[in-house]
Amino acid sequence: MKNTDVKYLEPHILSFLNNENAMNTLHDIRRGIERELIRTTPESRISNLPHPEELGSALTHPYITTDFAEAQLELVTPAMTERKTTFDSLASLHHFVATHLPDNEIMWGASMPPELPSDDEIKIAAYGTSNAGLHKVRYREGLANRYGKRMQLISGIHYNFSLPDSFWEILHSHIGSELSLNDFISERYFHLIRNVLRNGWIIPYLFGASPAVDKSYLINQEHALNLLDDETYYLPWATSLRLSNMGYSSNEQSFYPTSFNSKQEYLADLCHALTTPSERYTHLNGDQQLNASVLQLENELYGSVRPKIVSDQLRPLYAMCHHGIQYIELRSLDNNPLLPLGISEDQSYFLDAFLTYNALAPSPELTDSERELIARRQELVATEGRKEGLLLPTQQGDRELKELGLTLLSSMMPVASWLDNVFATEGHKQGIEREKVKFIDSNLTPSAQILTIMKDEKLSYKHVTQRLSEMHFKQHKDVEINKEEMAGLSRLVGESLAKQQRIETLQDMSFDEFIQKKNDLQCDCEIEEVVA
């Protein structure tokens, strides 16, 4: 019986792959990487020191900032067309940070946190005294009060990906779409997102690297994890505890599902969550969150993939309404502590093939029942994905994970060959072949490799991660980086600090007024109305 959960490319799309003009546009695919890391001490504990001034302003630096906690770094590369340049940029950021941290700190290379103190001792990120900075702090206070600080200290990698407008323009013509080009691009990104949701279980299976956690993460939590040693809890077949229900998730948001069937439906659902008070949060006062809505801000929406747009003038909801989607953010990648950068160029080849395939394969609208299947699949793969003979729910009934995975990789091959032809490489096909073997032998997955090290060497999660992090930290410090790039990063430190100071000096309203203005959200945005 043919597995129809995996979508094969349709004939008119296969003919599109032979379009020379379309092929030429692919050199303008852009990819950017964001990596979250925690600054830790030699004892594998979260640092209690402030964000180093030598790294610049966390509020205004474009590439080196903080996530939830003061000790939680976020390194952001620009979106670039050359894969090597993207990874060189990520390596440069790691080198710059490694050479500017206090002597007793390193960067924790895993997704699940190091040893954590009590919540009271975990410092929320600080951004200065400007309204914009205080707004970021208040938002994080809300996250802490809603979900707890521990969950917010789970770190990951975000892979930002866009196909060029020229590519979409040719596909628009090839299909004969009656939508405007801007609307067509947005709808195709939602098309891509729906398929990423369907097929996204493959990401934690292949790249999940969080099968275990330090016991301090679980204080005052109910859980079903097994004790590996005095300091470590784990699940024997887990791939990514980070992506499981005990990881980065929100029960409240599950009652307000967001549609990805069209831009209009997505924006309507998002605005509903941003303007609907939640009974769970109304007991918190104004100092404890930005507002009592299901979502304080758009960024609070959890999920493995997001539509994105960059705008300095408009909040994301309005920017997306007026200008459409610019790129997608794949959020389901764990930090792989076995890799110096947490992600590799080889992995990037696979991700590009995966995302391009999802942009081109058939993508019917998601029903409520299919969304439930997707959620069950992700939880099964996250918690027991390496279990021999594991069955995953599909619309045609249960199927073996191995069968589903190999079928999906096979269906991606025409796109991988196409990309290899364009870029004169074998990287995309090799990427798929490299991942195929993990379905044949689950011991080759990073989650299995990490558990093997822990068991064979009788070391805790904390000690294995500390050792790997120290090794990679030394590599980051020792690596040779382009002097011009280092000078540019040094210059950005001063510029970002000066920019923060200017912002703090030029306050034009009180913080209460600022909050009120930010919370004033209307859900009647007209799609046709274009604003600056």
How would you name each of these model-derived features?
Residues 425-532:
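Extended, compositionally biased alpha-helical segments that mediate assembly or anchoring
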Residues 321-322, 328-416, 420:
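Substrate-recognition/cap regions that form aromatic- and gly/pro-loop-enriched pockets
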Residues 19, 134-146, 153, 162-322, ...:
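Loop-rich catalytic cores of soluble enzymes, especially ATP-dependent carboxylate-amine ligases
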Residues 36, 151-164, 327-334:
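Histidine-centered divalent-metal-coordination microenvironment in nucleic-acid enzymes
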Residues 1-144, 151-157, 184, 191:
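Terminal catalytic/cofactor-binding subdomain
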Residues 113-115, 213-217, 371-381, 428-441:
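A glycine-rich phosphate-binding loop feature that marks nucleotide/adenosyl-phosphate handling sites
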Residues 39-41, 77-79, 111-113, 161-167, ...:
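Short, flexible loop/turn elements at secondary-structure junctions
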Residues 48-51, 87, 120-121, 171-172, ...:
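Short conserved micro-motifs at the rims of enzyme active sites and ligand-binding pockets
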